[in-house]
Amino acid sequence: MPKEPASASLPTVKVSPRGSNRLKDGHVWVYRSDIVTADSVPPGSLVTVTDHRGKPLGTALYSSSSQIAIRMISSEPITDLPALLRHRIAGAIAYRAPLVMDTDAYRVVFSEADFLPGLIVDRYAEILSVQILTQAMDADSVRQVVLTELTTTLDPASIVERVDPRVRELETLPPRASGLLQGEKSATTFTMNSVQFRFDALEGQKTGAFLDQRENYAASARYAKGDALDVFCYQGGFALHLAPHCTQVTGVDSSRPALEVADQNAALNHTLLNGKEIEWIEANAFDLLKDYSSSAHPHEARRYDTIVLDPPAFAKSKRDLDAALRGYKELNLRALKMLRPGGILVTCSCSYHVSQSNFLEMLASAALDAHRPLRLLEVRGQAKDHPILLSVPETSYLKCVIATVSR
């Protein structure tokens, strides 16, 4: 972790041996169960962290409500939080400069992975989308520093805050609506891999679009062929990348508003798609795959040359793991049954609690049950603008497997 200059005293939080060992191993979180003392520490404070004997371990942001009570920001003592924030934001922007030269949409700040816990910033052309996830980052003084630095460095037309009410409730923060923080523009068009997308900062999931899949969109396009099915297509990310390489593409999602945006995105890319029409189907993915893969009437079962599965996170916690793996297996089993010999499967999981080994074991089991031998072409993760901090495994969450059925 970057070192900062030493400075004056801060409130002190003492952690247990287990908590201090976790920090010494390079992680940046300490859970509430490992707090020994945090007497009279105001919510969202900058604090000095010590081990149970009182030895300083560094400086952190403190949450009085979250199960993650401590988020480390330096292994050295600091008090000038504004200077630290400006330095870290500038560092995050510089880190990405050589990685995003071919796109105007990317993640600018990725929380712990950029040593800025509780802050996420995405860029969509001239609009920045910000998420504040902790008590410390929600302080008015911190907000102002963040906005000023982003404005000075990136000169956006607008900055929009996307609010997750569940997170604010967990952090016992007052309710707040998503909205413009500065500027007036909330909608634009951005480009990924030469494909254009409509973006409205006050609509959609997460901070607006799935930027973490940008490199996987391009990779899937290299293998795409024939008739393609994009399941959980949302606003058409995979479908639009597949279409120039396929004879026919169908996108499936349960959200009518998302499909309406997907259709608008297809219209934006009319020339790139050579006038091809993408079929958009509003349906429950599990029900549709069950219907399409039915063996009751083999002559009626649908067959495809390329299938993409990009479902939402099935495992929000460890206790969801078994159910999540069952869900993933059902989806992949049905998709494998629908692929023609030599067909391409692109299958994803954005659940951190489903490890890469969990996911590959599930996929091997599905292939065995479907009697469709699978050969791996690529095992991929999130785009490089979503960096992975090796000492914080939670920063690695996206799995994307590209495979081909042998027969």
Q: Which residues make up each language-model segment?
A:
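Short, isolated positions in well-ordered beta-strands
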Residues: 57, 129, 196-197
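Short amphipathic alpha-helical segments
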Residues: 81-85, 138-146
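A short interface-forming secondary-structure element
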Residues: 127-139
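Non-catalytic accessory regions of SAM-dependent methyltransferases
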Residues: 1-125
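Rossmann-like S-adenosyl-L-methionine
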Residues: 178, 182-407
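Non-catalytic substrate-recognition/targeting regions of SAM-dependent transferases
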Residues: 109-122, 142-210, 218
